[in-house]
Curated annotation (Swiss-Prot):
UniProt KW keywords: DNA damage, DNA repair, DNA-binding, Glycosidase, Hydrolase, Lyase, Metal-binding, Multifunctional enzyme, Zinc, Zinc-finger
Cofactor binding note of this UniProt entry: Binds 1 zinc ion per subunit.
Name of the protein in its database record: Formamidopyrimidine-DNA glycosylase
Catalytic reactions of this protein: Hydrolysis of DNA containing ring-opened 7-methylguanine residues, releasing 2,6-diamino-4-hydroxy-5-(N-methyl)formamidopyrimidine; 2'-deoxyribonucleotide-(2'-deoxyribose 5'-phosphate)-2'-deoxyribonucleotide-DNA = a 3'-end 2'-deoxyribonucleotide-(2,3-dehydro-2,3-deoxyribose 5'-phosphate)-DNA + a 5'-end 5'-phospho-2'-deoxyribonucleoside-DNA + H(+)
Protein origin, superkingdom: Bacteria
Segments forming FPG-type zinc fingers: 241-281
Annotated active site: P2, E3, K58, R271
SUPFAM superfamilies with a match to the protein in the record: Glucocorticoid receptor-like (DNA-binding domain) (SSF57716), N-terminal domain of MutM-like DNA repair proteins (SSF81624), S13-like H2TH domain (SSF46946)
Record bears the keyword DNA repair: yes
Length: 281
């Protein structure tokens, strides 16, 4: 599933193609993805000018001037690509939503597994929308620091890995970047969340910020479906320290792979966790 860096990469790529442009045509090519597509989506977006394109957690917020906000989630396999209308290939079977601009560009929302979604919200009540209302702070914003993290983890005895995947604790984090951040901070994924305080919390916040920033700069991680808006792959997967590297040497210490087995894998809440048992405490 695309995590914060992948969604932010898509936002950055779509912004010059959409913001300030009028939508000359919008097409919904099926009635539903994960949720039903609003029956008035085409009518309410066609002819509108895009005022801004923001991100909240793993959601894209396409804001119209004098119009609604389109909330988009890429689901497990979704991507959004930009191309010229002239000479553009016919939409494929997995190209479900099309946005065409008066400037002659088409943005295609493709989602083979159909776990993504698009819906509409009113700008005045956007923060109270059911998909957004309970989200935690953005980890790259000034609203997120060690004090905030400690407060949100207070009283939680669940493992820190599970707590960080809770979108109500911190918004936008997923399995890849939580594993990578915990490794950088030297924190075991099994450690009780409420015990991450003081210098540990400072280290974790710094690690989260660093990992996310580096991943965005690399265009995200392309393990299966993620593509940038020009169709290019992200390449942060080549810089993983622990994720999907079971049995390989740990880059943070002098692990003896023959003795320790290298990077380990375990399953937490149905998700694979990768870590170094020697480095992370």
């Amino acid at each position: 599933m695309p995590e914060l860096p992948e969604v932010e990469t898509v936002r950055l790529g779509l912004t010059p193609a959409l913001v300030g442009e009028r939508l000359s045509r919008v097409a919904a090519r099926r009635p539903a993805l994960r949720l039903p597509i609003p029956v008035d989506l085409v009518q309410r977006l066609t002819g509108k000018v895009v005022g801004s394109l923001d991100r909240r957690a793993k959601y894209l917020l396409l804001r119209m001037i004098d119009g609604p906000v389109a909330l988009i989630h890429l689901g497990m396999s979704g991507s959004m690509t930009v191309g010229p209308l002239a000479g553009h290939a016919e939409p494929g079977p997995h190209d479900h939503i099309l946005f065409e601009t008066e400037a002659g560009l088409r943005v295609t929302f493709r989602d083979p597994r159909r776990f993504g979604l698009i819906t509409l919200a009113e700008p005045e009540t956007l923060d109270d929308h059911p998909l957004l209302a309970k989200l935690g702070p953005e980890p790259l914003s000034e609203a997120f620091d060690a004090e905030v993290l400690v407060r949100r983890l207070n009283g939680r005895q669940a493992p820190i890995k599970a707590a960080l995947l809770d979108q109500g604790v911190v918004a936008g984090l997923g399995n890849i970047y939580v594993s990578e951040a915990l490794f950088r901070a030297g924190i075991s994924p099994l450690r009780p969340a409420a015990s991450v305080t003081g210098a540990w919390a400072e280290a974790l916040v710094a690690a989260i910020r660093a990992v996310l920033g580096e991943a965005i700069a690399a265009g995200g991680s392309s393990l299966r479906d993620h593509r940038q808006t020009d169709g290019a792959l992200g390449y942060f997967q080549h810089r993983f320290a622990v994720y999907d590297r079971v049995g390989q040497p740990c880059p943070g210490c002098d692990c003896d792979v023959a003795r320790t087995g290298g990077i380990e894998r375990m399953v937490q809440s149905g998700r694979s966790t990768f870590f170094c048992g020697r480095r992370q405490r």
